[in-house]
């Protein structure tokens, strides 16, 4: 059946019906199979507990109020995360240079013979940044060209460490990092970063951290991240609201957005400027 001429939203639904769930992998998108990309009606029955029996003496970055917001609202925004203009500029330059040197690849969904691409669904270019257990970038050639990005990743590791040190039984498994560049006209349709269940506790993304480095971004440039705020993790919310509530988060430089990977749907609105640069680290 040829569905190439159908509207994008119809193609999405058809692809969702004929696809089979698959586990996350480094070559796929943040929604790693067609089913996860399309079928956004799934709701997990496993909650992410970020506020019980906290070891408050280990707080360095967060406090009880911020963790409560992350658990109940599902997201947290930290502006001026690095608060270092020189570092921000260097991270921007390193990121864009990776793109200009053709180190990024066009993003797609799924992998192998099942991999598919459609810029009307997802239009970014990506590069995976792999670090070892000692927080060293595994690719030595890459390491020498993104020293300031690695500095940022060290700072994001401190957040992961604080989750482990403050929240009993958080027990992070690993992190995964991706550099993404969108050009003018690029977008990414509504999706979740993972689906959380008792059978996949060790393979699911739990926390998404997105760092933006878009200098001189202004209203009208597009590329906002539309975050849908119906949060199934909120135990006080007896049932999800039928109306879709959302906030549009501006991708301004030195802004860090943190949200619950399995629960909050989101999309990248069409970019009217380029490059739109985001560095995402997921905590498993």
Swiss-Prot record:
E.C. number: 1.14.11.-
Free-text comment on the cofactor: Binds 1 Fe(2+) ion per subunit.
GO molecular function: ferrous iron binding; L-ascorbic acid binding; peptidyl-proline 4-dioxygenase activity; peptidyl-proline dioxygenase activity
Keyword Iron belongs to the record: yes
One Pfam family here: 2OG-FeII_Oxy_3
Activity control note: Inhibited by the prolyl-hydroxylase inhibitors alpha,alpha'-dipyridyl and ethyl 3,4-dihydroxybenzoate.
Reaction(s) catalysed by this chain's protein: L-prolyl-[Skp1 protein] + 2-oxoglutarate + O2 = trans-4-hydroxy-L-prolyl-[Skp1 protein] + succinate + CO2
Binding site for 2-oxoglutarate: 276
Highest taxon listed in the record's lineage: Eukaryota
Annotated Fe cation binding sites: 191, 193, 266
GO biological process per UniProt: cellular response to hypoxia; culmination involved in sorocarp development; oxygen metabolic process; SCF complex assembly
Enzyme class: oxidoreductase
Statement: the UniProt record of this protein carries the keyword RNA-binding: no
A single cellular component GO annotation: cytoplasm
Keyword set, alphabetical order: Cytoplasm, Dioxygenase, Iron, Metal-binding, Oxidoreductase, Vitamin C
Subcellular location: Cytoplasm
Domain Fe2OG dioxygenase span(s) in chain numbering: 169-284
Subunit structure: Heterotetramer of two alpha-1 chains and two beta chains (the beta chain is the multi-functional PDI).
Family recorded in the similarity comment: Belongs to the P4HA family.
Function: Catalyzes the post-translational formation of 4-hydroxyproline.
Protein name, per record: Prolyl 4-hydroxylase subunit alpha
Natural source organism: Dictyostelium discoideum (Social amoeba)
Gene: phyA
């Amino acid at each position: 059946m040829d569905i190439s001429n159908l509207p994008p939203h119809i193609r999405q639904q058809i692809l969702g019906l004929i696809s089979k769930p698959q586990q996350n992998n480094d070559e796929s998108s943040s929604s790693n199979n067609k089913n996860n990309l399309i079928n956004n009606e799934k709701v997990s029955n496993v909650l992410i507990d970020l506020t019980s029996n906290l070891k408050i003496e280990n707080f360095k970055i967060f406090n009880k109020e911020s963790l409560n917001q992350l658990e109940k609202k599902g997201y947290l925004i930290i502006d001026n995360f690095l608060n270092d203009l020189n570092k921000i500029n260097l991270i921007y330059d390193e990121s864009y240079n990776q793109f200009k040197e053709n180190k990024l690849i066009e993003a797609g969904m799924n992998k192998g013979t099942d991999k598919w691409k459609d810029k009307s669904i997802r239009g970014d270019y990506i590069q995976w940044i792999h670090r070892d257990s000692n927080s060293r970038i595994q690719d030595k050639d890459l390491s020498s060209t993104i020293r300031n990005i690695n500095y940022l990743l060290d700072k994001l590791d401190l957040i992961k460490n604080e989750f482990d040190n403050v929240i009993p039984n958080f027990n992070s498994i690993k992190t995964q990092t991706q550099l993404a560049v969108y050009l003018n006209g690029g977008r990414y349709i509504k999706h979740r970063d993972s689906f959380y269940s008792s059978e996949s506790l060790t393979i699911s993304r739990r926390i998404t951290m997105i760092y933006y480095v878009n200098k001189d971004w202004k209203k009208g440039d597009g590329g906002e991240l539309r975050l849908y705020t119906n949060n199934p993790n909120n135990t006080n919310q007896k049932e999800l609201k039928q109306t879709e509530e959302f906030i549009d988060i501006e991708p301004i430089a030195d802004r860090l957005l943190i949200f619950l990977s399995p629960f909050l749907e989101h999309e990248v609105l069409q970019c009217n400027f380029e490059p739109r640069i985001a560095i995402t680290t997921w905590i498993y």
